[in-house]
């Protein structure tokens, strides 16, 4: 006898299909006959023959209420969207993009409206556009360009290092009011982030060794590095030496013009994202290495519109396979 499925069972069918499970295995999991699962898939798949849980639920509810083309979103979808906002800090555009790749079509403005209609106030603080960034002022003023020996200007950087080529990096530090610093690096084409607390503050030689250690596993894919004129990067020739590969052109560190943060926009944007989790008034002593690594992993798993809503991690490591 045919039994009407509920939303949770449809979601289990959707997950089972995505995992490649057989119809019989899916049927056993939700305690129905295989014929019920087959009927559900045939009846509620989309025009491309894909079975998507929330679309299937909407079609069922539309038939149930006699509303042809009913486009109301099931409550389960809103619960999932809430989790994406609260747990992952994803923007409506990122959520709409990721759901769209799953065949679930929802406009980012619809998600914004949902957030603004939330009377509990739980959702709004997690939206990126709710953050208010002021212009970053470092505890120590940038070193004048003339004080960095053997400095190579950004104006000598090759034209192909335009942010589209894989292997061009930017680096910077974020600081607190207690003299602590965190090194940040990003690969420009994928926005992949590396970060680590600097145990000796902004001393040039220890900073150079940390940069080289973080980039060493990927040194074959380090073509250029761009940074500002901070005193912590004065030992840039040590970075070049430590990342050198015999028979290949040496990695050059290029320095932006003083007070021209737009010349290294990728790392500036990365730092803003990091500040979501490490606010400016923080004491970095409160952030363990493990906690900083969790922040790095979270940002690298975050979908980006620039990457067609893929993650920096996926786009970065596809170059190694």
PLM feature spans:
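Two-metal-ion RNase H-like nuclease active-site motif
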Residues: 166-175
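Acidic/histidine-rich, metal-coordinating catalytic segments
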Residues: 220-235, 257-259
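Short conserved beta-strand segments at catalytic cores or DNA/RNA-binding microdomains
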Residues: 174-194
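Basic, flexible linker segments flanking DNA-binding modules
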Residues: 55-59, 106-161
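Short, basic alpha-helical/linker "hinge" immediately adjacent to a nucleic-acid-recognition surface
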Residues: 1-89, 93-98
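Charged alpha-helix within mobile-element recombinases
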Residues: 31, 82-87, 216, 250-253, ...
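Active-site beta-loop-alpha junctions of metal-dependent nucleic acid enzymes
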Residues: 175-178, 195-218
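Mobile genetic element proteins and their domesticated derivatives, centered on retroelements
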Residues: 13, 37, 81, 95, ...
């Amino acid at each position: 006898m045919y039994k009407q499925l509920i939303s949770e069972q449809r979601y289990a069918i959707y997950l089972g299909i995505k995992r490649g499970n057989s119809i019989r295995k899916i049927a056993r999991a939700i305690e129905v006959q295989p014929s019920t699962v087959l009927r559900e898939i045939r009846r509620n798949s989309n025009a491309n023959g894909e079975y998507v849980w929330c679309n299937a639920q909407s079609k069922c509810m539309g038939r149930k209420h006699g509303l042809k083309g009913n486009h109301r979103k099931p409550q389960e979808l809103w619960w999932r969207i809430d989790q994406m906002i609260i747990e992952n800090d994803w923007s409506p555009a990122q959520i709409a993009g990721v759901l769209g790749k799953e065949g679930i079509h929802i406009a980012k403005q619809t998600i914004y409206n949902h957030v603004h209609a939330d009377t509990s106030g739980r959702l709004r603080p997690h939206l990126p556009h709710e953050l208010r960034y002021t212009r970053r002022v470092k505890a120590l003023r940038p070193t004048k360009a003339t004080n960095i020996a053997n400095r190579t200007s950004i104006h000598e950087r090759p034209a192909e290092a335009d942010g589209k080529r894989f292997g061009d990096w930017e680096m910077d530090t974020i600081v607190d009011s207690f003299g602590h610093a965190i090194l940040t690096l990003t690969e420009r084409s994928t926005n992949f982030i590396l970060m680590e607390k600097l145990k000796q503050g902004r001393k040039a030689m220890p900073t150079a060794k940390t940069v080289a250690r973080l980039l060493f596993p990927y040194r074959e894919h380090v073509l250029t590095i761009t940074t500002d004129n901070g005193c912590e990067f004065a030992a840039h020739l040590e970075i070049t030496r430590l990342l050198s590969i015999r028979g290949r052109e040496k990695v050059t560190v290029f320095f932006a013009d003083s007070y021209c943060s737009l010349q290294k926009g990728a790392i500036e944007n990365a730092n803003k994202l990091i500040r979501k989790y490490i606010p400016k008034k923080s004491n970095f002593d409160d952030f363990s290495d493990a906690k900083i690594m969790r922040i790095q992993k979270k940002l690298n798993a975050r979908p980006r519109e620039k990457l067609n809503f893929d993650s920096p991690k996926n786009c970065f490591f596809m170059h190694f396979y």
